[in-house]
A protein has these predicted regions:
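Amphipathic alpha-helical packing elements
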Residues: 2-39
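Short amphipathic alpha-helical segments that mediate assembly, nucleic-acid/protein binding
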Residues: 4, 29-30, 44-45, 67-68, ...
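Eukaryotic acidic, Ser/Thr-rich intrinsically disordered low-complexity regions
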Residues: 4-7, 126-153
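Structural detector for internal amphipathic alpha-helices that build alpha-solenoid repeat scaffolds
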Residues: 19-22, 46-61, 83-98, 107, ...
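Amphipathic alpha-helical scaffolding segments comprising HEAT/armadillo-like alpha-solenoid repeats
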Residues: 27-34, 58-77, 98-110, 129-141
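Short, contiguous, helix-prone interaction/anchoring segments in small proteins
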Residues: 34-45, 49-52
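Alpha-helix N-cap/helix-start positions at coil->helix boundaries
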Residues: 42, 79-84, 114-118, 145-149
């Protein structure tokens, strides 16, 4: 039985006890869920899109890293799914409370896509969970005359 099937069983068991599903923090489970989301033919596509949006823990969990990277792929137009537009992907990143989401937002802000760079910069201006390495990366880009980094700082 794979992790996703185990998660579904756990949800059913918890439901009988009057409990909601546990949040997802496992990177391996997140990858399985994202695989279902990527596959529009998967019978679990819709359910997994919902899990991706609502059940993955934010912050620095392994699931958050997988989610942030997948949202980056959506923003970079590598994947298109009905449930998450580019703007919705930015919104989801904005609520992830630091860690991997900040790295993705900085990648996008300092990237070559002008529109997405501006959107990422606007989200970064609202974030308070930046590590020293994140700030150092922005300062380095600023010193290299990156106008987006200047705008963020």
């Amino acid at each position: 039985m794979n992790l996703f099937e185990q998660y579904l069983e756990e949800i059913a068991t918890r439901k009988k006890q009057g409990l909601n599903a546990k949040p997802i923090d496992s990177g391996d489970l997140a990858r399985e869920i994202i695989a279902h989301v990527k596959s529009t033919n998967s019978e679990h596509h819709d359910q997994c899109a919902n899990f991706l949006i609502f059940n993955m823990l934010p912050g620095t969990t392994k699931a958050a890293k997988e989610k942030a990277e997948f949202l980056k792929q959506i923003i970079n137009d590598n994947y298109q799914i009905d449930e998450i537009s580019i703007d919705r992907a930015f919104e989801l990143l904005s609520h992830m409370k630091g860690g991997p989401s900040i790295q993705v937002l900085i990648d996008l802000a300092l990237g070559q896509d002008g529109e997405n760079s501006k959107k990422a910069a606007e989200v970064l201006k609202t974030q308070v969970f930046l590590y020293e390495a994140d700030t150092a990366r922005l300062i380095s880009a600023y010193r290299d005359n990156n106008s987006t980094a200047e705008d963020i700082l």
